[in-house]
UniProtKB/Swiss-Prot annotation:
Keyword Hydrolase (UniProt): yes
UniProt-recorded Gene Ontology molecular function terms: metalloendopeptidase activity; zinc ion binding
Source species of the chain: Streptococcus uberis (strain ATCC BAA-854 / 0140J)
Keyword Transmembrane on entry: yes
This protein's name: Protease HtpX homolog
Bilayer disposition of the protein: Multi-pass membrane protein
GO terms of biological process kind: proteolysis
Gene3D superfamilies on file: Metalloproteases ('zincins'), catalytic domain
Record: active site: 144
Cellular compartments annotated: Cell membrane
């Protein structure tokens, strides 16, 4: 059951990434059609922008992310239990030892960052280290190590970059349309049924693609959380430890300092406890659902 769930989560992520590229292609084609009457130009521009965004964000320094989240790097002497658990989980996962950080905050949380296992880092709040016992902490760190091993940070970063590119292209297209960039071409365009269909499709793409892209990005984030939970159990062989850790995380207070949206998706638990109108707009699946999945492994 464990390996079936891991495989299912991976398949869902592949499907969502493909959906992203479809959206990027659609928004590029729509912008190209409306502004310069060239689908090809719009698609090429969209793919170039998406690639630039992705590469620039993937190679963002780990130190920058840790600095944004007020994390400080530690040595084995400063927190030996925490350090050795990270070391043990990395060894079991067969990845290089990541850097270890602590965030001085009473809330219960942790995250991992880094574009590859070779430049990864794991951070945990001081509150988490004080409240969790060893088995629970192994579950949390196993979750973060799984994010590193599964290249989740890279996948999530690509998702954020593609969503940003889609939003940027839609915004540019809408502004240029509004200020007259495509107005004359629209007036002169073929009024055939097919032309009207293309026009409606293009306009709807500019309007709806950013919203759908955001929903797909958040869905990827949620799927990777489920996958990391299951992968943590694969590493620790202790589902109860992970379940108890999630139960404690559900009772945690929000973090004491603001956390930006990009960093928020990295954490094992929603750091600001924002109430969402729908699970479709949440970076994390409900903890109750995560526990339920673990119980049925």
């Amino acid at each position: 059951m464990l390996y079936q769930q891991i495989a299912q989560n991976k398949r869902k992520t592949i499907f969502l990434i493909l959906a992203f590229f479809f959206l990027l292609t659609a928004i590029g084609a729509a912008a190209g059609y409306l502004l310069v009457e060239s689908y090809q130009f719009g698609i090429v521009l969209a793919l170039i922008l998406g690639s630039i965004y992705a590469f620039s964000m993937i190679f963002q320094s780990t130190n920058v992310v840790m600095g944004m989240n007020k994390a400080r790097e530690i040595t084995v002497d400063q927190a030996p239990d925490f350090f050795h658990i990270v070391e043990d989980m990395a060894m079991v996962a067969q990845i290089p030892m990541p850097k270890v950080y602590i965030i001085d905050d009473p809330s219960l949380n942790a995250f991992a960052t880094g574009s590859s296992p070779e430049n990864a880092a794991v951070a945990a709040t001081s509150g988490l280290l004080q409240v969790m016992n060893r088995e629970e902490l192994e579950g949390v760190i196993g979750h973060e190590i799984s994010h590193i091993r599964n290249y989740d940070i890279r996948i999530s970063t690509i998702a954020v970059a593609l969503a940003s590119a889609i939003t940027l292209i839609a915004s540019m297209g809408s502004r240029m349309m509004w200020y007259g960039g495509g107005r004359q071409r629209q007036n002169d365009r073929d009024n055939s049924s097919l032309g009207i269909v293309f026009l409606i499709f293009s306009l709807l793409s500019l309007i709806l693609a950013p919203l759908i892209a955001s929903m797909v990005q958040l869905a990827i984030s949620r799927q990777r959380e489920y996958l990391a939970d299951a992968s943590s159990v694969e590493l620790t062989r202790n589902p109860e430890g992970m379940i108890r850790a999630l139960e404690k995380l559900s009772q945690s207070q929000p973090m004491s300092h603001p956390v930006d949206d990009a960093s928020s998706a990295l954490y094992i638990n929603e750091p600001q406890k924002r109430e969402s109108l729908s699970s479709l707009f949440s970076t994390h699946p409900p903890i109750a659902d995560r526990i339920e999945r673990l119980r049925h492994m």
